[in-house]
Amino acid sequence: MTRKNYTSLTEFVLLGLADTLELQIILFLFFLVIYTLTVLGNLGMILLIRIDSQLHTPMYFFLANLSFVDVCNSTTITPKMLADLLSEKKTISFAGCFLQMYFFISLATTECILFGLMAYDRYAAICRPLLYSLIMSRTVYLKMAAGAFAAGLLNFMVNTSHVSSLSFCDSNVIHHFFCDSPPLFKLSCSDTILKESISSILAGVNIVGTLLVILSSYSYVLFSIFSMHSGEGRHRAFSTCASHLTAIILFYATCIYTYLRPSSSYSLNQDKVASVFYTVVIPMLNPLIYSLRSKEVKKALANVISRKRTSSFL
């Protein structure tokens, strides 16, 4: 068998999600609607947080950053997937494949850290209310957000050094709808044990590390909520955290299933389904989850609509 290294390989073939033309058209329309809602919903959330002064808090600052990451992440994956669903030649250049993977890894890392920061913010707000303005001052939360993006860039650089050195044999067919490290490791004819271990460690540090921050923060939050004497106070505090917990469960469940299970149990078809959730569906659901569960967001949206109606009559 002739061996090709990454310098001689010019393109990959993405098998995608469907084999038949009818199913491809249905999926194209379905994902086009989801992508449109994702972009409009998240950009709308960013704009709403920007124009409403009541949402100028650390919690909603992190949410605006999360919405930005969701738009970027979805745009990294979905447009290419939509194009492939309507194309017979589902190819992606070698450089394009690795750029897609690196941007995805960087943005996913940032998203995990933002979830952790949002959990810490809820801990500070509910468990340390008197010190909240000091703990989460503007300088502090700006540095936290900058650190989240810097960590994503660092993970990007570390993955560049070991994944791009993979060698490939005759086959260039990726059994996935986008370029991700697990299917590339499967495709490579290099000895990938060390590289897979490094990738798993990096994913584990990011996912498990931020999850520990989330679990410890919410352990204190729930203890404080149940210690409140006022039923109204408990309901308000729990309602504030419910949307964040819902988004966390959806995101981390699919990420853990995809990246932290043993490689021996790796299933291409099951991984595709899980990947659809955290790359396409969850970015659309996040603004819906936060807007439906948050009284502040609903109030801000009502104020914007009210002002627009008033101005239209003038």
Swiss-Prot record:
Superkingdom as given in the UniProt entry: Eukaryota
Q: Which residues cross the membrane?
A: 26-46, 55-75, 100-120, 140-160, 197-217, 238-258, 272-292
- The record's disulfide annotation reads C97-C189
Q: How does it sit in the membrane?
A: Multi-pass membrane protein
Q: Glycosylation: which residues?
A: N5
Primary localization class, coarse: membrane
What GO annotations for molecular function exist for this entry?
A: G protein-coupled receptor activity; odorant binding; olfactory receptor activity
- Ranges of the Extracellular topological domain: 1-25, 76-99, 161-196, 259-271
Compartmental location: Cell membrane
Q: Which InterPro entries match?
A: GPCR_Rhodpsn (IPR000276), GPCR_Rhodpsn_7TM (IPR017452), Olfact_rcpt (IPR000725)
Q: Which parts of the chain does the record assign to the membrane side Cytoplasmic?
A: 47-54, 121-139, 218-237, 293-314
> SUPFAM superfamilies given for it?
Family A G protein-coupled receptor-like (SSF81321)
Any one GO biological process = sensory perception of smell
Task: Keyword check for Repeat, yes or no.
Answer: no
Q: Which UniProt keywords apply?
A: Cell membrane, Disulfide bond, G-protein coupled receptor, Glycoprotein, Membrane, Olfaction, Receptor, Sensory transduction, Transducer, Transmembrane, Transmembrane helix
Q: Which PROSITE patterns match?
A: G_PROTEIN_RECEP_F1_2
Q: Which family does it belong to?
A: Belongs to the G-protein coupled receptor 1 family.
Instruction: Relate the protein's function as given in its record.
Output: Odorant receptor.
Q: What is this protein called?
A: Olfactory receptor 5F1
**From which organism does this entry originate?**
Homo sapiens (Human)
